UniProtKB/Swiss-Prot annotation:
Binding partners and assembly: Interacts (via the HRR domain) with TPM1; the interaction appears to contribute to the antiangiogenic properties of the HRR domain. Interacts with THBS2; the interaction blocks the antiangiogenic effect of THBS2 with CD36. Interacts with THBS1 (via the TSP type I repeats); the interaction blocks the antiangiogenic effect of THBS1 with CD3. Interacts with PLG (via its Kringle domains); the interaction tethers PLG to the cell surface and enhances its activation.
Stretches for region Necessary for endothelial cell focal adhesions and anti-angiogenic activities: 348-382
Region of interest (Interaction with ATP5F1A), residue spans: 41-84
Protein name, UniProt field: Histidine-rich glycoprotein
Marked site positions, Cleavage: R439, R440
Domain Cystatin: residue ranges: 19-136, 137-254
Organism name: Homo sapiens (Human)
Signal peptide: 1-18
Name of the gene: HRG
Region called Disordered, residue ranges: 252-407
Disease: Thrombophilia due to histidine-rich glycoprotein deficiency: A hemostatic disorder characterized by a tendency to thrombosis.
UniProt cofactor(s): Zn(2+)
Biological process per Gene Ontology, one example term: negative regulation of fibrinolysis
GO cellular component terms listed in the entry, alphabetical order: blood microparticle; cell surface; collagen-containing extracellular matrix; extracellular exosome; extracellular region; plasma membrane; platelet alpha granule lumen
Tissues expressed in: Expressed in macrophages and in malignant cells. Expressed by the liver and secreted in plasma (at protein level).
Length: 525
């Protein structure tokens, strides 16, 4: 009996210590693939590019390897709607100001075999922040650049720009502005320029619940006199738009998802090349290589919508709203389809509440002073040293701070065309931002319901100043079942590691080495 007890204790000890640090350079292929899957999962914002693997641990459970990764990232200028591979994003147009936004993501991924193509992302949690103001050096510069946090204030400018584009491109007649992603202002010389990036979506005049989803992305440049106060009438307006074909991002296996299981465009092994933007005969060439929802039963294969508007490719089948209590814990992987566990226990479900990425009104002044648009009541991460947070950003009891919810990413969400029904349940629950960082919702960026537990969250924090470090994302991930795992003495997944691997962090890949100062670990050991 004593021998049996000793054996059981040894087995338990073995599994309790199974999560082990690993070399950051050794897991680089998995980290790159995981970041690609995360980008393809996201609905809003810009593609993350990998700067560095900050930490890496792994756990081997029978034939499955679980990766616990901490990735330092930087936003590119490519919209996530492009579905590009993050390393294929071209450098930004030097004529337009490009905001420098850094971030850190904690990621849990699994691989059942030794093939990297089998990698699945189980969950992720990211924090991002702009460092443009902190890096600005305009002591002798005649040009001042501001990056605004409250982008919703410039929706009128986006609408005006899109209207001009519609006048010259009939195929864009039914498109509307969706989200205002970035707004920059350049002052100096002979005038003032506003540079507005925004996503658009197709909104036909008549409601067709089976209408395919089509999204696009536009960049508008509006120029005014130096002291112009009226932003309604720019002296010059230039806009470039491109549309992304959802058919290119369907299940690459060609197998339609089961009805009732949320299907998402993300999870492809590789991003397909986007088709050229709509360019009707006689229209001007409005594009250059940018870096950058409706619900119902699936339509029959031969069904098409003949409403007014651009000819739309057939996209992923929209879905009927479904009860969260019937959802399964879903993951997404490189086979192009969303994966589901076979555990239907409602306790494994994590209802989320869907919120957009929005911030207080805030502009980044080159001298780190607040322009008139600033909201002085917003909380800042100033003075928060990484060691002042819980290890790896872990919140004590897994609750989020009051008043803040994550942005859950789902292509099957509602946009400006389709306000959610009043009886539509909200099913969003996330991991929470770093403690002490609350953010108020802005106008026009309300909750977007979706069908089921969402994978992954991205939190936009206030801009960093010189000497500050990016707060770490939380790591209170919910439990998930490992595939093909039947061992009764080992939990499904381990808590996210609190220690740092001795073989980490890796080296920075960025062309901006100065951003390294904003991360916890600046130099490799």
């Amino acid at each position: 009996m004593k021998a049996l007890i000793a054996a059981l204790l040894l087995i338990t000890l073995q599994y309790s210590c199974a999560v082990s640090p690993t070399d950051c350079s050794a897991v680089e292929p998995e980290a790159e693939k995981a970041l690609d899957l995360i980008n393809k999962r996201r609905r809003d914002g810009y593609l993350f590019q990998l700067l560095r693997i900050a930490d890496a641990h792994l756990d081997r459970v029978e034939n499955t390897t679980v990766y616990y990764l901490v990735l330092d990232v930087q936003e590119s200028d490519c919209s996530v709607l492009s579905r590009k591979y993050w390393n294929d994003c071209e450098p930004p147009d030097s004529r337009r100001p490009s905001e420098i936004v850094i971030g850190q993501c904690k990621v849990i991924a699994t691989r059942h075999s030794h093939e990297s193509q089998d990698l699945r992302v189980i969950d992720f949690n990211c924090t991002t922040s702009s460092v443009s103001s902190a890096l600005a050096n305009t002591k002798d510069s005649p040009v001042l650049i501001d990056f605004f946090e409250d982008t919703e204030r410039y929706r009128k400018q986006a609408n005006k720009a899109l209207e001009k584009y519609k006048e010259e491109n009939d195929d864009f007649a039914s498109f509307r502005v969706d989200r205002i992603e970035r707004v920059a202002r350049v002052r100096g010389g002979e005038g003032t320029g506003y540079f507005v990036d925004f996503s658009v979506r197709n909104c036909p005049r008549h409601h067709f619940p089976r209408h395919p989803n089509v999204f696009g992305f536009c960049r508008a440049d509006l120029f005014y006199d130096v002291e112009a106060l009226d932003l309604e009438s720019p002296k010059n307006l230039v806009i470039n738009c491109e549309v992304f074909d959802p058919q290119e991002h369907e299940n690459i296996n060609g197998v339609p998802p089961h009805l009732g299981h949320p299907f998402h465009w993300g999870g492809h092994e590789r991003s397909s090349t986007t088709k050229p933007p709509f360019k009707p005969h006689g229209s001007r060439d409005h594009h250059h290589p940018h870096k950058p929802h409706e619900h119902g039963p699936p339509p029959p294969p031969d069904e098409r919508d003949h409403s007014h508007g651009p000819p739309l490719p057939q996209g992923p089948p929209p879905l009927l709203p479904m009860s969260c209590s019937s959802c399964q814990h879903a993951t997404f992987g490189t086979n192009g389809a969303q994966r589901h566990s076979h555990n239907n226990n409602s306790s494994d479900l994590h209802p989320h509440k869907h919120h957009s990425h929005e911030q207080h009104p805030h502009g980044h002044h080159p001298h780190a002073h607040h322009p008139h648009e600033h909201d002085t009541h917003r909380q800042h991460p100033h003075g928060h040293h990484p060691h002042g947070h819980h290890p790896h950003g872990h919140h004590p009891h897994g609750h989020h701070p009051h008043g803040h919810h994550p942005h859950c990413h789902d292509f099957q969400d509602y946009g400006p065309c389709d306000p959610p029904p009043h009886n539509q349940g909200h099913c969003c629950h996330g991991h929470g931002p770093p403690p002490g960082h609350l953010r108020r919702r802005g106008p026009g960026k309300g909750p977007r319901p979706f069908h089921c537990r969402q994978i992954g969250s991205v939190y936009r924090l206030p801009p960093l100043r010189k000497g500050e470090v990016l707060p770490l994302p939380e790591a209170n991930f919910p439990s998930f079942p490992l595939p093909h795992h039947k061992h009764p003495l080992k939990p499904d997944n381990q808590p996210f590691p609190q220690s740092v691997s001795e073989s980490c962090p890796g080296k920075f890949k960025s062309g901006f080495p100065q951003v390294s100062m904003f991360f916890t670990h600046t130099f490799p050991k």
